[in-house]
From Swiss-Prot:
InterPro entries: DNA_rep/recomb_RecO_N, NA-bd_OB-fold, RecO, RecO_C
Protein name (Swiss-Prot/TrEMBL): DNA repair protein RecO
Keywords: DNA damage, DNA recombination, DNA repair
Gene Ontology CC annotations of this record: bacterial nucleoid
Similarity field: Belongs to the RecO family.
Species of origin: Stenotrophomonas maltophilia (strain K279a)
Task of the protein: Involved in DNA repair and RecF pathway recombination.
One Pfam family cited in the UniProt record for this chain: RecO_C
Keyword Cell membrane: no
Biological process according to GO: DNA recombination; double-strand break repair
SUPFAM superfamilies reported for this sequence: Nucleic acid-binding proteins
Length: 239
């Protein structure tokens, strides 16, 4: 199958043999695509190599053969965001999460748009925590793994003053215990309603979403977590 003039975001690239790269791209028309880019380490291939850096938005053509597609050509469509510090780790997180959960060769236009929007927010220095929570919500929805955020699993409307655990399969479940550990790991009702309405909540409510959303994602990721979680963990108080 030929892939002609598709656009995509580079999620990951690593060296393969002496002059090639193995590249993972989230594309607009074909979903996640694995590419073999030959000759990028030669003098003539430097421009192509530069276009295949993580977070780069590209237009590309390839010949699909089995799991990997042979890259025929690619060009950068903009300047990749120059991210540093926390924003750089957040960009790594977006890409790693997409790489782990999005299946290959399954078009996911909503996820493509969500990734592009999150990338744009990182580029302009938008709030990291809200950018990540919005992307997590959109990713789960695009993969068919999302759930209602404005009503609990028992059908009752979310109470802004209550706290809720997020069950990966059932959705929001009202917390009945006020024990400190359980309370800290639960999202506020206000935060869930804000996430449902796509309106950034107050800082304390926003912070309450991190652990419940991670629990949901961890369920779908399986026993192997994310490398980016290990790095982001130390930044949690500031996110």
């Amino acid at each position: 199958m030929m892939i002609e003039d598709d656009t995509g975001f580079v999620l990951h690239a690593r060296a393969y043999r002496e002059t090639s790269l193995l590249v993972e791209v989230l594309s607009a028309q074909h979903g996640r695509v694995g590419l073999l880019a030959r000759g990028v380490s030669t003098a003539k291939g430097q421009v192509l190599r530069a276009a295949l850096q993580p977070l780069q938005w590209i237009r590309f053509s390839a010949q699909q053969r089995g799991e990997l597609a042979q890259l025929r050509g690619a060009e950068a469509l903009d300047a990749a965001p120059r991210l540093v510090g926390q924003a750089m780790l957040a960009g790594f997180y977006l890409s790693e999460l997409t790489l782990r959960l999005a299946p290959r060769q399954d078009p996911l236009p909503e996820l493509y748009l969500a990734y592009g929007e999150a990338r744009a927010r990182l580029a302009v220095g938008a709030g990291l925590a809200w950018t990540l929570r919005r992307f997590e919500r959109e990713l789960l929805t695009a993969l068919g793994l999302g759930f209602e955020l404005d009503s609990a699993s028992d059908g009752q409307p979310i109470d802004p003053a209550a706290r809720y655990e997020l069950d990966p399969q059932e959705g929001a479940q009202r917390l009945l215990s006020e024990r400190g550990g359980e309370r800290r790991a639960a999202a506020t009702g206000s935060a869930l309603l804000a996430l449902a309405a796509d309106e950034e909540p107050a800082a304390a409510d926003l912070a309450s979403l991190r652990l419940p959303m991670r629990r949901v994602l961890a369920h779908h990721l399986g026993p192997r977590g994310l490398k980016s979680w290990e790095m982001l963990e130390q930044l949690a108080p500031r996110r």
